[in-house]
Amino acid sequence: MARCFDLSIIMQSDDYRGINNSTLIEATLFDSGRPLIVVPYIQQERLNLDRIVCCWDGSRAAVRAINDALPLLRKANAVELFIVENEKTANDSVIGGSEIGRHLARHDIRIEVRTTPAADIDVPNIILSHVADSAASLLVMGGYGHSRLREFVLGGATRGILSAMTVPVFMSH
């Protein structure tokens, strides 16, 4: 059904109320070919596009998410590209922040690029802390950049973000 719409909107799972949308979120990401916004179960107000943070690791999923989010990025007052520096983002073959910044500039979207080292903190916590510190109103990211099996066994950024998010998350795969 999601294939027939520009965007799907799904509420975050809420264990307290017995709502588990993780299967629906995964199915929408993998099978619809369309982006989705996952809304935190604590969300009370309407979607605000004041400040958008885009996670960037140079992956296909990140490229897809940023390009699918172009209509929203154009409406934002501020757009930030956030890079958690690790082995993957340090690789010369990965499209760097300046290149994707030039791409967005061709769409009349100005960005600020922020980087932070991965250190000993897991990536989802780094991202969520940055989103809170920057007062972002929307997070854009690629969803499930690794195989579902790897994400299930080892965990991953997508699962970590979806379990503890406090702002809506725009995702594409």
Residue locations for each model-derived region?
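Short Asp/Glu-rich motifs
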Residues: 21, 48, 92, 123-124, ...
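Structural beta-alpha unit
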Residues: 1-8, 106-139, 145-150, 159, ...
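Intrinsically disordered or low-complexity boundary/linker segments at protein termini
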Residues: 1-82, 163-173
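Short glycine/serine/threonine-biased micro-segments
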Residues: 53, 140-143, 153-154
